[in-house]
């Protein structure tokens, strides 16, 4: 008898790929294709992308020194802002913390954008090039590739460690193989709204580093089209989703939002900067940080409530997670 999960324990290794493929097919049966999507809206965002897409290596002046003269995100978005420890830190320590936290957020964004690209390409394999969705999804994949290179370049120039998202392999496996398109669209919107809040604030803050402001501006403009597509998809297709897929999408939407916000600030940052051992606990219990988390999720929660993804049963769970007032 072969135990089904006895990997590396002296037992024969079973082939689990049919099992995984079966689960993936099951969720896809509960998904929908955007066949009723507005062609007019698709043409609008495709045309906008053709007219206004950005090459970060041409648009951004990377020669600006990555020193400690500017913050790398708005001060009030740094995890220790508003605490006694923050008050005791020098300006340079605060700036360095903002740099590491910005690069940690970039690493999380790259990780999630790669997962999204995988799901889009997986879907595109079966889509006709005559379908308008084919062109939009190709544009979105291309955008995400440029964004990942842009954020990777910023991490490299800041000369900080790569803050690899925690449990990334397990979460990536689940996302790639066990989520429906609807659930992935909800989680995509979660990532784009959360990072969009940070980017929008950074782009408008004159105290922030010029490169951070410019790459945030680029990301804000291009992600606005991605969010618009996700909004239209969910508005038109959520009513057609089966009961089981709805339940899974609701759960995954909350889970993915919590994971994304949780991953933004890697716990190793405080140790790497020589901050006191209690810094992590102080940041986690920071009331100001809790308010920022709610602000990050506010636009997402408003939309998901509008389309009934966050319903009366789901709302208390979002509040308990600290993502909803």
Set out the residue ranges of the language-model regions.
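C-terminal transmembrane helix end/exit motif
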Residues: 155-159, 230-237
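Helix-loop elements that line ligand-binding/catalytic pockets
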Residues: 227-233, 250-253
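Active-site metal-coordination segments of metallo-dependent hydrolases
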Residues: 137
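Active-site-proximal alpha-helical scaffolds that flank and shape metal-associated catalytic sites
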Residues: 153-221, 248-259
């Amino acid at each position: 008898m072969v135990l089904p999960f006895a990997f590396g324990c002296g037992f024969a290794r079973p082939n689990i790929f049919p099992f995984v493929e079966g689960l993936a097919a099951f969720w896809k049966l509960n998904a929908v294709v955007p066949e009723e999507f507005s062609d007019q809206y698709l043409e609008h965002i495709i045309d906008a992308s053709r007219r206004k897409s950005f090459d970060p290596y041409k648009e951004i002046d990377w020669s600006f020194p990555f020193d400690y003269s500017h913050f790398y995100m708005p001060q009030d978005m740094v995890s220790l802002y508003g605490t006694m420890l923050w008050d005791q830190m020098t300006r340079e320590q605060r700036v360095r913390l903002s740099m590491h936290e910005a690069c940690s957020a970039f690493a999380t964004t790259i990780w999630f954008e790669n997962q999204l690209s995988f799901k889009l390409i997986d879907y595109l394999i079966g889509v006709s090039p005559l379908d308008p969705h084919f062109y939009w999804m190709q544009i979105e994949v291309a955008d995400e590739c440029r964004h990942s290179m842009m954020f990777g370049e910023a991490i490299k120039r800041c000369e900080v460690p790569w803050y690899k998202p925690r449990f990334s392999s397990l979460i990536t496996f689940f996302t790639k193989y066990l989520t429906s398109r609807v659930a992935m669209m909800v989680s995509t919107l979660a990532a784009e709204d959360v990072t969009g809040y940070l980017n929008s604030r950074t782009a408008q803050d004159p105290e922030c580093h010029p490169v951070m402001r410019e790459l945030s501006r680029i990301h804000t403009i291009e992600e606005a089209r991605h969010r618009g597509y996700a909004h239209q998809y969910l508005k038109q297709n959520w009513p057609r989703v089966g009961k089981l897929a709805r339940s899974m999408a609701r759960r995954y939407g909350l889970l993915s939002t919590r994971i994304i916000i949780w991953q933004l600030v890697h716990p190793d940052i405080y140790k790497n900067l020589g901050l006191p051992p209690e810094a992590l606990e102080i940041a986690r219990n920071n009331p100001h940080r809790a308010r920022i988390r709610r602000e990050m999720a506010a636009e997402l929660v408003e939309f998901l409530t509008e389309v009934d993804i966050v319903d009366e049963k789901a709302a208390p769970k979002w509040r308990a997670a600290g993502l909803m007032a």
